UniProtKB/Swiss-Prot annotation:
It comes from Aspergillus ruber (strain CBS 135680). Residues 105-171 are annotated as: Cupin-like domain. Belongs to the virC family. Its EC number is 1.-.-.-. This is Cupin-domain-containing oxidoreductase fogC. Signal peptide: none annotated. The keyword Transcription regulation does not apply.
Amino acid sequence: MAEQTETSTAGYNYVSYGTEQHPIAGLSRVVRHITGHDSEGRSVFLSTDIGDHHRTLGEKQAISNIIYSTNQTPVELNGNHDIEFARNTEPGLHVKDGSVARLIDFAPGVESPLHRAVSLDYGVVIEGVFKMVLDSGEERIMRPGDISVQRATAHKWINVTGNGTLPGRMLFVLLDCNDVYVNGKKMEGYLGTLAKDYEGRSS
């Protein structure tokens, strides 16, 4: 079992497993299957792998696996343009006019900083139990199969699996959206201490 050490930094509370491996120790291996067509128009598997882009977030308290990303709507599938983009581009938090499917493994007890993505986000609990907290103070407990629909709202995630003693996993699908206004005030995105994890990446 990977070494566990108590760690604390601004904006985060977590137990670090002290590893950058994917998946995080204690979670199942993830396999991605991409399909397409052969020369006769039959459906075929083009690849089976574990994804193109993996990144440790923060101080090893979470690991991101980009399942797929696109940069236009509708998506151009002809000529495998979408596959080339997904393979060659590690996206930012979200992609303008596009989409990002991101799997995140959370170490035990991780609490993310409060943040807002100006996008439409679907969050699905795959393994574990999570608490979703909004900037209003409202919160919900989410279990495997539960889904959140974040409409450019400020929130944070807390991995409460096993009362904070076990890792957990969520899938996030982020879609670009128009600017959002509330009573004439534009809702601005902010990432807090997450910002450094997305610097210099395509968005």
